Amino acid sequence: MNLHMLLTSSILGLYLHVLGGDQLMGHYTANLRDIEFCLFELLGRDEILGKSIYKDLDRDTAMGMLEEIKRLSENDLAASFVEGDRMGVDFNPATGDVKVPASFKKSYNSYIEGEWWRLDTPPELGGTKIPASLRWAIAEMVLGSNPSVHIYASGYAFAQVAYYLGTDEQKKIAKLMIERHWGASMMLTEPDAGSDVGAGRAKAIQQADGTWHIIGTKRFITSGDSDLGENIVHFV
């Protein structure tokens, strides 16, 4: 999908949202002028646009993306921030199911339906290639509005890891992660190893059938469970 199609899809989603009569409101206001200054006047990122791997991206298109994610962040994404923060997730010990608040699911789906996940997806799997500086400018607004949306949507970025660094079998899993919109978790933290991941003591022992037995403790699992998708791939 090219950049113009991505923008058209996202803008259409916003139009239908307003047409349906939903009230748009939120706690967050993005400083787009500051972001524009940092990207193009301070860092001069427009110098790399329109060339090589970014030949289909110019400054106007980049600004269009920023303006659209600003609208989405200030409205749809921000709308569930308070309720999501106060309620958190609901865990059913009898079934083991985890559910996020309905309002948060609505915010998350607005991000996914706008196809912003393509920015974290390998081009070979339908992703859209943009400079890292622009990608993180977009992420800044999503994180400022509703951090959990960005974190839960990181499954697509994890699919990149599996696709570029994984085995042939793991590459197939990466494709499924994209096609079926699976989530992903990152399991690093241990009781005695927080930011010092080198202090981790968990061990993985490969078995004859190709599986691994993991011995140890992991905690504070990022986006470890939810009902946002049919499956979650755990990166340990």
Identify what each model region corresponds to:
Residues T211, I215-V236:
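A short core secondary-structure module
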Residues A153-Y156, G166-W212, T217:
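Internal maturation/activation junctions in enzymes
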Residues K129-L134, V161-Y164, D196-G200, G224-D227, ...:
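Short acidic, glycine/serine/threonine-rich loops at helix termini
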Residues L12-V149, A153:
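Amphipathic, small/basic residue-rich leader segments at the start of a protein or domain
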Residues L125-K129, F158-V161, E169, D192-D196, ...:
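Flexible loop/turn segments at secondary-structure boundaries
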Residues W136-E140, Y156-V161, M186:
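Contiguous, well-ordered alpha-helical segments that form the cores/surfaces of helical PPI scaffolds
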